[in-house]
Amino acid sequence: MKRMIALDGAQGEGGGQILRSALSLSMITGQPFTITSIRAGRAKPGLLRQHLTAVKAAAEICRATVEGAELGSQRLVFRLGTVRGGEYRFAIGSAGSCTLVLQTVLPALWFADGPSRVEVSGGTDNPSAPPADFIRRVLEPLLAKIGIHQQTTLLRHGFYPAGGGVVATEVSPVASFNTLQLGERGNIVQMRGEVLLAGVPRHVAEREIATLAGSFSLHEQNIHNLPRDQGPGNTVSLEVESENITERFFVVGEKRVSAEVVAAQLVKEVKRYLASPAVVGEYLADQLVLPMALAGAGEFTVAHPSCHLLTNIAVVERFLPVRFGLIETDGVTRVSIE
């Protein structure tokens, strides 16, 4: 019998990342775990619908036995069975992030007995989670270089607070892992600005695009009007395609915040990324830790290691026989497998 790993949910960023990473790693390694003080660092601690959906999804995919799987629970015990590929559908029942649920269960399906398809309904444009286009256009091309083949499709948008969005991912078992080396970003090839609107006047998007174009030379400017029943909502994105990597940044519009202010927030974030020689942005760095650890090698550079990144590394090192090294040089942090 494999040993039970005990985790403190209050460590590091004190949010849902510890739980999601633990679920992924438990499903992959077969090691059971207990986590206490779940989301202790949040204003509303314990499991929310999004986290509970991730737990139930993980349990269904690997036939696990779970204690504490209920709303508001701050303690969870997870003992898994066998991971099985197949077709799965999960509903969050709120505007909680679809992509964070997918992020939890997809790594286990890289090791399943056959191809799988996972569909999640809930929120798609959430300021606290990567949108589907980030997964599709930024993360998945890098996963393919590592040897992980999955394809994410956004079937319907769902903005906060209504939700109602649908995201699906098809994934195949991994044959072998490759090493990902992201040492240099390379020259910028092109930049693309994009605005999504649902139930919001078009002039809002036009002003947001104008703000982006006032700071960057955009090769593409796209405005997408979504059906009104998918909103109300507004998301502004800017994609930076460089020779060795594509990064994508986004901001979700808010009521009573002007289009110019919303877009200016995005401009500031992109300028901060471009001012640093670091290859990956803060959010992408979080996503690369687990696949890199499974490959057993690799490296990337990031401007500053976020609390999310450090927490993710700490959890990975509890489950896998790997050690990460973080070395700061010339204003960036090099993250690698030691």
UniProtKB/Swiss-Prot annotation:
Protein localization: Cytoplasm
Catalytic activity: a 3'-end 3'-phospho-ribonucleotide-RNA + ATP = a 3'-end 2',3'-cyclophospho-ribonucleotide-RNA + AMP + diphosphate
Annotated residues for binding of ATP: Q103, Y283, L284, A285, D286, Q287
A biological process term (GO) from this entry: RNA processing
Record carries keyword Nucleotide-binding: yes
Keywords: ATP-binding, Cytoplasm, Ligase, Nucleotide-binding
Gene Ontology CC: one annotated term: cytoplasm
Enzyme class, UniProt record, top EC level: ligase
Gene3D superfamilies: RNA 3'-terminal phosphate cyclase domain, RNA 3'-terminal phosphate cyclase, insert domain
Major site of localization recorded for this protein: cytoplasm
Position of the signal peptide: none
The EC number(s) this enzyme carries: 6.5.1.4
Domain of life where this protein originates: Bacteria
MF terms in GO: ATP binding; RNA-3'-phosphate cyclase activity
Residue numbers annotated as active site: H308
Disulfide bonds: none
InterPro entries assigned to the protein according to its UniProt record, in alphabetical order: RNA3'-term_phos_cycl_insert, RNA3'_phos_cyclase_dom, RNA3'_phos_cyclase_dom_sf, RNA3'_term_phos_cyc, RNA3'_term_phos_cyc_type_1, RNA3'_term_phos_cycl-like_CS, RNA3'P_cycl/enolpyr_Trfase_a/b, RPTC_insert
Primary role: Catalyzes the conversion of 3'-phosphate to a 2',3'-cyclic phosphodiester at the end of RNA. The mechanism of action of the enzyme occurs in 3 steps: (A) adenylation of the enzyme by ATP; (B) transfer of adenylate to an RNA-N3'P to produce RNA-N3'PP5'A; (C) and attack of the adjacent 2'-hydroxyl on the 3'-phosphorus in the diester linkage to produce the cyclic end product. The biological role of this enzyme is unknown but it is likely to function in some aspects of cellular RNA processing.
Family: Belongs to the RNA 3'-terminal cyclase family. Type 1 subfamily.
Record-linked NCBIfam families: PRK04204.1-2, PRK04204.1-3, RNA_3prim_cycl
Protein name, entry field: RNA 3'-terminal phosphate cyclase
Organism: Shigella sonnei (strain Ss046)
Encoding gene per record: rtcA
